[in-house]
């Protein structure tokens, strides 16, 4: 339920706050007695940044009825408990950036590639294919979409399929796509995937209808 997602986000933000407080306390104590290190400072900065990011992009989003739906469907499709989902997301910033970009895109009603968020905004490729009602696709097709967007922005193109594969892996974990067994090779850019037309897919299709 959406209520359990709000509660889970609150629990995980409390955990992150504890870590940030502890890291800050450690740094301050070490600073006072002259034993502080670069690592102490880096740990404190990383922990406080993580907490702020989670509050701004997840906690605030789940309190908004419309935006909470992104996490609701993503968590439902991933078949994870909400707390586990959020903890995993915080350890995999690559995935979280994409989900957060998706949330922001739903708020604005459009999902496009952005030079301001080159990692998160790659999720546009997924939305483009859903909008075009494509049933099956290859990792090479995702790679091409990403490079078309980068070319339009006049920035360096991807040389290999790593970024395309990472986006597809996230979509697999979220229960949005599945690999077509025995069809193509990921290394050659010919591995085939198909969309799973579940609640999450339908939600995304509705959210970005032209």
Please report, for each region that a protein language model flagged, where it lies by residue.
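Long, low-complexity, charged/polar intrinsically disordered regions in eukaryotic proteins
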Residues: 8-13, 21-122
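Intrinsically disordered, low-complexity, charge-biased tails
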Residues: 1-4
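Short acidic, hydrophobic short linear motifs in intrinsically disordered regions
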Residues: 132-155
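A short, conserved structural fragment
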Residues: 172-184
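Short, amphipathic alpha-helical interaction segments positioned at domain boundaries
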Residues: 194-210
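Short, amphipathic alpha-helical "recognition" segments used to contact nucleic acids or chromatin
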Residues: 125-133
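Short amphipathic alpha-helical interaction segments
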Residues: 155-173
């Amino acid at each position: 339920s959406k209520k359990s997602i709000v509660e889970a986000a609150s629990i995980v933000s409390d955990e992150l706050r504890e870590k940030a407080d502890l890291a800050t306390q450690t740094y301050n104590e070490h600073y006072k007695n002259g034993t502080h290190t670069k690592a102490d400072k880096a740990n404190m900065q990383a922990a406080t940044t993580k907490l702020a990011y989670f509050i701004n992009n997840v906690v605030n989003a789940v309190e908004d009825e419309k935006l909470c739906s992104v996490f609701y469907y993503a968590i439902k499709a991933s078949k994870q408990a909400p707390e586990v989902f959020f903890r995993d997301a915080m350890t995999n910033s690559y995935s979280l950036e994409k989900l957060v970009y998706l949330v922001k895109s739903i708020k604005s009603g459009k999902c496009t590639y952005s030079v301001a968020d080159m990692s998160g905004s790659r999720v546009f490729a997924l939305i483009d294919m859903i909008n075009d009602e494509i049933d099956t696709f290859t990792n090479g097709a995702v790679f091409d979409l990403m490079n078309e967007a980068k070319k339009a922005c006049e920035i360096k193109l991807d040389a290999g399929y790593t970024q395309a594969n990472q986006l597809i892996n996230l979509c697999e974990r979220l229960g949005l796509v599945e690999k077509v067994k025995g069809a193509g090779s990921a290394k050659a850019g010919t591995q085939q995937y198909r969309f799973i037309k579940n609640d999450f897919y339908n939600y995304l299709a509705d959210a970005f209808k032209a």
